[in-house]
Amino acid sequence: LFISFLVYQQWQLDKNPPVQQQTTEQTTAASSDVPASSSSSAEVVADSQTKGQIITLENDVLRLKVDTLGGDVISSELLKYDAELGSKEPFVLLKDTNEHVYIAQSGLIGKNGIDTKAGRAQYQVTGDNFKLAEGQNELSVPLTFEKDGVTYRKIFVLKRDSYDVGVNFEIVNQSGSAIEVEPYGQLKHTLVESSGNVAMPTYTGGAYSSSETNYKKYSFSDMKDKNLSIDTKAGWVAILQHYFV
């Protein structure tokens, strides 16, 4: 059970590309545009100390907390799964604490990107708690950021009885000049060792699916020691955590 955040995000972007009033040129963003993904857990935690407004999004199976600084998902609770046998608390998958970081980041990079190592977009939103209402099948929550005559909307979409988290970007360019941006997404996770026992070992690490290889696991040590960057026309990236895939 993996919250297919990045998969669904990319599907949405392919299906519904951002709308702009000015024609934009395609560009390949340098990797330095992407907010840093540190190999040190201490650095990762330090990187997340500055926060914006924390808002809550909830449907019937999932509760999310989103930081308006960047619009990152910093917490997810699986409401139909107990934290442990006999517990009344839901299982927490994504979290952002001093001891453990596992968050889903996404944004816009490139020449005119609003998410860089120098800073993230500070979105505005009306309200702080959004819940799927009785009889409602879809919850849509827009976050808005304006800069230099351009309005950016990052829209989260939750559907009833679904763990998918839709993330759409809408851009209204009234600046009079073309802009160059492209979407990025990444999962940020504290480095951990696999645990469990001999009879039932558990695994925490990464997994790729690409047009060349349907499924391949990568440990955190692989990520630390190797360049795992690949080019593919289709695929997904996931973090496997214990028995949740």
Report each predicted region and the residues it spans.
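Subset of Sec-pathway N-terminal targeting signals
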Residues: 1-34
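Generic low-polarity alpha-helical segments
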Residues: 4-11, 15, 45-50, 57, ...
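Short, Gly/Pro- and small/polar-rich lid/capping loops
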Residues: 29-55
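Soluble non-transmembrane domains of integral membrane proteins
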Residues: 54, 58-245
